[in-house]
A protein has these predicted regions:
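Membrane-embedded catalytic cores of phosphoryl/pyrophosphoryl-handling enzymes
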Residues: 159-306
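Hydrophobic alpha-helical transmembrane segments
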Residues: 100-119, 175-185
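Hydrophobic alpha-helical transmembrane segments of integral membrane proteins
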Residues: 124-153, 212-220, 224-227
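Extreme N-terminal basic, low-complexity initiation segments
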Residues: 2-8, 12
Length: 308
């Protein structure tokens, strides 16, 4: 009798778990966009204080620097820090080579492309924030014209993983800006309600963001301050993107299934581009992007076919 009671109790628990999981799946499938919209409504402008403080302190530091030339002061002031971080982080070259690719829109966007189908609001904000990031990066890189580490330091003095980046477009790091736009949007979009979960979620997301951003130092492509300012600017672009889309719904057409054929064509082109990347470099991270693109193409195609 006791054994039968235990079995019934166990089955009841399993049944409850199944119902909870089923309800969770149903919420994810049909209410995820509403969940994201509601979370974005709680994002406030005061949350820009920290990244703006970072920017102010950064420019004050160089404003009162003894060097008259910003570029010279910028490069020399962090040489020791760059060499130290590069040496430490480059201890895992294969990992760094893969995760640094996550700062590339052609690689990171496919990994979250499925939310175009399940949470289009996230993509409305992502496109707005990405446009802001693109403009900021282009203007600042051209204005400051800071040479890359490999253009200034002896290339035998530090570790370069993958491609050797030259030229004068080091500041700020575009990869860091991109990844932090994505990280901050995901952070707020899927912020849990419980405080304990919120803390864990925030720490995990920020840890992932910092790890990816500072991989740019590990591969020898950027100075540490390039990354720090890139992070701050990405944070700012994400918050502004959220606030803009809370008030101006200029990309609301994204969720309209009439435009699915255009998205399907875009996904096919994107798949081809990722395949070319795989042919050229064959990194595992590219396969994850490819699988995500193929899966999303299947979902959107099926949804469009059912509608028609």
């Amino acid at each position: 009798l006791t054994k039968n009671t235990m079995q019934r109790t166990f089955c009841s628990v399993i049944g409850c778990l199944k119902n909870m999981i089923y309800k969770k799946i149903m919420i994810n499938n049909f209410g995820l966009d509403a969940f994201v919209v509601n979370n974005f409504k709680h994002v406030k402008l005061w949350q820009l204080m920290l990244p703006f403080l970072v920017l102010i302190l950064f420019f004050l530091f160089f404003l009162f620097s003894e060097e008259t030339n910003f570029v010279d002061a910028y490069v020399e002031s962090q040489k020791g820090l760059f060499l130290s971080m590069n040496s430490t982080l480059a201890a895992y070259p294969n990992i760094q080579l893969n995760i640094t690719e996550l700062g590339d829109v052609f690689v990171i966007f496919p990994l979250i492309i499925v939310f175009l189908f399940y949470a289009p609001k996230l993509w409305e904000v992502l496109l707005t924030s990405s446009l802001i990031t693109l403009i900021l990066a282009a203007v600042l890189k051209k204005y400051f014209y800071v040479p890359r580490p490999a253009h200034v330091y002896d290339i035998d003095s530090f570790i370069i993983i993958g491609k050797t980046h030259l030229g004068n477009k080091s500041f700020p790091s575009g990869h860091s800006m991109t990844i932090f736009v994505v990280i901050i949007l995901l952070l707020f979009a899927f912020m849990p309600k419980k405080k304990s979960y919120t803390i864990v979620w925030s720490l995990l997301m920020l840890l992932a963001g910092f790890s990816i951003a500072f991989s740019r130092v590990a591969v020898g492509a950027h100075y540490p301050f390039d990354v720090v300012i890139g992070i701050a600017l990405g944070f700012i672009a994400a918050i502004i993107g959220i606030r803009v889309n809370n008030n101006v719904r200029w990309l609301v057409w994204i969720k309209n299934k009439r435009f699915y054929p255009g998205f399907m064509l875009l996904l096919i082109i994107w798949i081809a581009l990722i395949i070319l990347k795989i042919i050229d470099h064959n990194l595992p991270i590219f396969y994850l992007s490819l699988m995500s693109l193929v899966g999303t193409l299947f979902l959107i195609t099926r949804a469009y076919a059912k509608q028609n």
